[in-house]
């Protein structure tokens, strides 16, 4: 009870937005207002992964090409066991939880770097009302949205010198989709500039940026063409 009382404002704000996000995302799905692309395709893929079947794109293509030949998205594999609990709502629920977790990450980041008690709450609310979130929720599910919500926690890990944690978070973001790896590359470049006076952090971030770029290039040049029926990316 003490923990709840201590964080009552952030819990209340987050609960209100969980309700709002659910009214958009889950209600749309309940009334059959969600789409075959991407939610239908991805839910089908997650269901197949949960049953140890390699998911394909036969739902949208004439050939039985593995879905990994489109986007190299490993979140569908990671989240697939949850389909036994939540069925076709799985990815929508995961996305909502990710958004709330991302908001809390932003709150914590501003709480750590600043000394004004009100700023973290403003940052939290700003994130929750950001228009891009509602565009994503109204068009079902996106793995890159889930990955984006990890970014604040990545910032916190770098700020607090939690290098092992930062590597784990980086890997989790990279496996969302190949294009997000390029986004992470530029994030790390920005952090290199931010921490340019800290040699240890700079070297660590340079390594992470190179890992991100290498992952992006390997996936688009080698892995996706391997799974693609056209043997090329895109």
Regions found by a protein language model. Give the residues of each.
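Extracytosolic helix-loop segments that constitute the early lumenal/periplasmic catalytic or substrate-binding loops
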Residues: 23-26, 41-67, 74
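Short helix- or helix-capping micro-motifs
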Residues: 120-131, 170-174
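Membrane-lumen/periplasm interface segments of specific transmembrane helices
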Residues: 24, 38, 48, 55, ...
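Short acidic/glycine- and proline-prone juxtamembrane loop motifs at membrane-interface regions
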Residues: 135-144
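Juxtamembrane segments of multi-pass membrane glycosylation machinery
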Residues: 51, 70, 74-95
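Transmembrane-helix motifs of polytopic, lipid-linked glycan transferases
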Residues: 89-114, 153
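Specific aromatic-rich, kink-prone transmembrane helix
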Residues: 105-108, 129, 143-170, 186-188
């Amino acid at each position: 009870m003490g923990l709840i009382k201590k964080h009552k404002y952030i819990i209340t704000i987050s609960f209100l937005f969980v309700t709002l996000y659910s009214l958009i995302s889950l209600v749309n799905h309940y009334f059959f207002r969600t789409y075959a692309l991407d939610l239908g395709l991805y839910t089908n893929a997650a269901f197949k992964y949960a049953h140890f079947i390699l998911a394909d794109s036969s739902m949208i293509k004439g050939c039985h090409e593995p879905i990994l030949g489109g986007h190299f998205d490993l979140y569908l594999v990671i989240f697939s066991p949850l389909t036994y609990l939540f069925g076709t709502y799985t990815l929508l629920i995961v996305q909502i939880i990710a958004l709330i977790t991302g908001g809390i990450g932003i709150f914590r980041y501003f709480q750590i770097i600043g000394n004004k008690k009100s700023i973290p709450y403003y940052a939290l609310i700003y994130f929750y009302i950001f228009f891009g979130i509602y565009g994503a929720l109204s068009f079902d599910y996106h793995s890159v949205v889930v990955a984006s919500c990890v970014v604040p926690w990545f910032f916190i890990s770098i700020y607090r010198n939690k290098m092992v944690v930062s590597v784990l978070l980086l890997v989790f973001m990279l496996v969302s989709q190949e294009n997000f790896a390029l986004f992470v590359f530029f994030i790390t470049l920005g952090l290199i500039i931010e921490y340019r006076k800290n040699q240890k952090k700079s070297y660590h971030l340079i390594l992470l940026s190179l890992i991100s770029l290498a992952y992006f290039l390997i996936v688009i040049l080698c892995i996706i063409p391997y799974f693609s029926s056209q043997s090329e990316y895109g």
